[in-house]
Swiss-Prot record:
It is found in: Cell membrane; Postsynaptic cell membrane; Basolateral cell membrane; Endoplasmic reticulum membrane. This is Muscarinic acetylcholine receptor M3. Homodimer; the dimers can form tetramers. Interacts with NALCN. Interacts with TMEM147. The muscarinic acetylcholine receptor mediates various cellular responses, including inhibition of adenylate cyclase, breakdown of phosphoinositides and modulation of potassium channels through the action of G proteins. Primary transducing effect is Pi turnover. The gene is CHRM3.
Amino acid sequence: MTLHSNSTTSPLFPNISSSWIHSPSDAGLPRGTVTHFGSYNVSRAAGNFSSPNGPTDDPLGGHTVWQVVFIAFLTGILALVTIIGNILVIVSFKVNKQLKTVNNYFLLSLACADLIIGVISMNLFTTYIIMNRWALGNLACDLWLAIDYVASNASVMNLLVISFDRYFSITRPLTYRAKRTTKRAGVMIGLAWVISFVLWAPAILFWQYFVGKRTVPPGECFIQFLSEPTITFGTAIAAFYMPVTIMTILYWRIYKETEKRTKELAGLQASGTEAETENFVHPTGSSRSCSSYELQQQSMKRANRRKYGRCHFWFTTKSWKPSSEQMDQDHSSSDSWNNNDAAASLENSASSDEEDIGSETRAIYSIVLKLPGHSTILNSTKLPSSDNLQVPEEELGMVDLERKANKLQAQKSVDDGGSFPKSFSKLPIQLESAVDTAKTADVNSSVGKTTATLPLSFKEATLAKRFALKTRSQITKRKRMSLVKEKKAAQTLSAILLAFIITWTPYNIMVLVNTFCDSCIPKTFWNLGYWLCYINSTVNPVCYALCNKTFRTTFKMLLLCQCDKKKRRKQQYQQRQSVIFHKRAPEQAL
């Protein structure tokens, strides 16, 4: 947009003439020009709204009517879109439970900062430009600047927090994600706002009392202590160039790590296909353990103390009869493993939506499958790397050897019967470490040697192989889903960072140039550069909608006023389910 003035001085920059050339005495940024958090002009081309003959009483500030209409219409549309977009983000977070994730808490904080800019900063700045003077008084000026700077600083701080959160989530999934809760996210968001407030609000509001006088002329509004180009440039370095550099480096690391995960997952799926035609015993690799520890130092400490134990997983099975018919039935019903509790238990304990490979620990693991009626030990050492449930010997829980001996003795009493019990509900799958004791010599011989495999019945071998393949498939599926979520989060982050860099860079380049060439930047460019920084708050909700399908569908639902319909459908569904339940209850009682 192009703004003109009837006076010889610029209506936006008091020390810039109509030809935009400074005299030597006017070196540096104009009196009314200060950086907005080191990134854009808070007086924003506000200027010394007075002509050489005295203050102007023109409410249009020397602009024509059509210029005022154009400026008011354009900036009003931008402010309205900013307000509506960020309100949609906040309301969507409130009404849609699927959006209440840790990632979106940071986006919610960013939306609050953008909403403040759209409601307060944009409109006051538009009035400032149109009237060519600040007509609301000194207190309103200082409050506006304080709110504007705090909200903008909070936006940058939130972007930094989001970048670090994504980086640690991908590079340290086990250690960081265990601590990554909504409470911790709230603390980080609170710190971002508190730091922003402490950095800017006291200095803006009370600087005139610190120095003993107010040097901002009447009719102008700018930060008193940011009047020198060198100070302005210093704040730009600290507030824009450094954060952008840090965020760019973090995003590059996130991108490389995501690409690495994609290749690993492709190899994992390929090895899973080969495993279906081979034995389920594979060489081990790195990372996951059922105890969720990943620090090798802790593992070595447990090894030095020579503590041994095992991790138990239980699953429910059907009644088992040791007959050929039952064996044939079990052999043909591989799909029944899809719905048992073992799959769910291992799936939940071995992987989650927000867990990935984070440890470089290399170890050999063994699974001991003990079935009632048989003391056969199935050695399944060297499970596949990050895909299977791996239990380092040093990380297993401590178990008293006497209790283990009692358990073996109890199982032996069942063996004396010569047959399986007619029905049982629990089968223990025990992940055991080597125990160098005479009482468990049979266990030690099979676990301690990674190549020894005792003869198994056809039934046991089939069940064990199915179990291993099902577990592998489920963990692979979990990892694939987790990778998809990470990619979506990375896409949202990349869109936000790209919008931030595009909208904030032009003004900060002008700040850099103005430090060395104070007459090179036209006043109109200062205006556009500052407004472009404000437009970042307008673009952010669009980034959320483009990169997140849940946000997009929720926005559509809110804009079309479909919230009540969705609630009614949900209530009707719950009522139907309640009626069905009450109808079935008497029948089951009979």
